[in-house]
């Protein structure tokens, strides 16, 4: 029997597992191939929903389903914490000592926000990257009566356009509550332009200007003083705030560090086209877990899962697994509460947002609902 273990049951892990079981249904049903997903959570979460939770446009329950329900019944689900990966012995060791051998391993451990890495952010600010954070931000917005709103961005972080979406949704949300004239919004970004993607930066500049949103670049948040309500950057600039919203920096999963497989951020060195872990021909990496200099987004994991699933299936059947990932990413961008745009790009083509509109916003909402078909490997 050939064994494929998928470490991580998030977007990338679920998609790659469900795609493989569909493509290998004969081998799986015959007991020739076994697929196992390791998940350290019981609930599968559609994390982009938390942005809508912050504006009271969704509830957390809309974003969650049991992990067992997300996976095909023929996929073995191991719920628990993986202690480490041992590539030399071709196995994953669980925290309870269970050993899971593999012929192929897919690392899809994702990323996690670490707001504590910015001094004072936990005590003095808010974010929307977890259920708890989104609910606290929702409460803060509901009681907000005006003042200075400052958004700061830590790097790296998942969903590259989320800071822009929050600011543009906030602007329209404040206008709808009659608070626009009483509020000053300040958008900061850690590099010398408004976004890491040049095309997105060029697009959003005039959009922010038309809405009267102040922008500060080269602003890397270092210290937040919750009492004085100030945030000071690594560059030495200090801004005052009445409401501070942060995009927390992210790290890879601790199992990567315990296994000695990653860099200082727990990102796994990965070939940009084959998605094989560098130095191994039996370990694939996808989604946020890679060290690739591309957007950490759900669509990235999806497009990579297509390649990884097809290549593992091909190799299990005696082929070479020669499909290549081209760096494709697709992101909707909410430009308010009722309009959106999108960008698509890859290693060769830079992003260029199209004109925003209400129809694209409806597409975005439809995509949110169809996410569960995506994880099932149907879309």
Where do the PLM segments sit?
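Glycine-rich, N-terminal phosphate-binding loop of Rossmann-like dinucleotide-binding domains
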Residues: 9, 96, 109-110, 235, ...
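Internal hydrophobic alpha-helix adjacent to the cofactor/substrate pocket in enzyme cavities
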Residues: 17, 172, 301-327
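A Rossmann-like FAD-binding core segment of flavoenzymes
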Residues: 32-36, 75-92, 100, 174-270
């Amino acid at each position: 029997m050939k064994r494929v273990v998928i470490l991580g049951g998030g977007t990338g892990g679920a998609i790659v597992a469900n795609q493989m079981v569909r493509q290998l249904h004969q081998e799986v049903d015959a007991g020739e191939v076994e697929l196992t997903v390791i998940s350290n959570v019981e609930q599968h979460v559609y994390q982009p929903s938390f942005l809508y939770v912050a504006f009271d446009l969704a509830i957390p329950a809309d974003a969650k389903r049991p992990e067992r329900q997300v996976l095909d019944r023929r996929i073995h689900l191991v719920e628990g914490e993986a202690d480490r990966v041992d590539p030399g012995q071709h196995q994953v060791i669980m925290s309870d000592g269970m050993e899971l051998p593999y012929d192929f391993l897919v690392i899809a451990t994702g990323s996690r926000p670490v707001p504590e890495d910015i001094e004072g952010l936990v005590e003095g600010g808010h974010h929307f990257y977890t259920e708890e954070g989104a609910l606290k931000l929702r409460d803060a917005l509901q009681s907000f009566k005006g003042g200075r709103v400052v958004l700061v961005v830590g790097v790296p972080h998942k969903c590259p356009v989320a800071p822009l979406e929050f600011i543009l949704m906030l602007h329209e949300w404040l206008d709808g509550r009659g608070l626009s004239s009483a509020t000053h919004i300040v958008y900061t970004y850690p590099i010398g332009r408004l976004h890491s993607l040049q095309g997105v930066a060029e697009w959003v500049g005039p959009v922010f200007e038309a809405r009267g949103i102040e922008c500060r670049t080269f602003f890397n948040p270092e210290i937040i003083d919750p009492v004085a309500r100030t945030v000071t950057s690594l560059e030495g600039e200090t801004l005052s705030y009445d409401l501070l919203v942060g995009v927390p920096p992210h790290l890879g999963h601790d199992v990567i560090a315990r296994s000695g497989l990653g860099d200082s951020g727990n990102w796994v060195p990965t070939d940009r086209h084959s998605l094989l872990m560098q130095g191994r021909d039996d370990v694939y990496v996808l989604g946020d877990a890679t060290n690739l200099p591309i957007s950490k987004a759900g669509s990235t994991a999806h497009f990579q899962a297509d390649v990884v699933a097809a290549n593992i299936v091909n190799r299990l059947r005696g082929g070479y697994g020669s499909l290549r990932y081209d760096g494709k990413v697709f992101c909707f961008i909410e430009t308010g509460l009722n309009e959106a745009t999108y960008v698509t790009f890859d290693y060769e083509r830079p992003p260029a947002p199209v004109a925003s509109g209400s129809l694209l916003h409806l597409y975005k909402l439809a995509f949110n609902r169809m996410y569960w078909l995506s994880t099932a490997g149907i879309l």
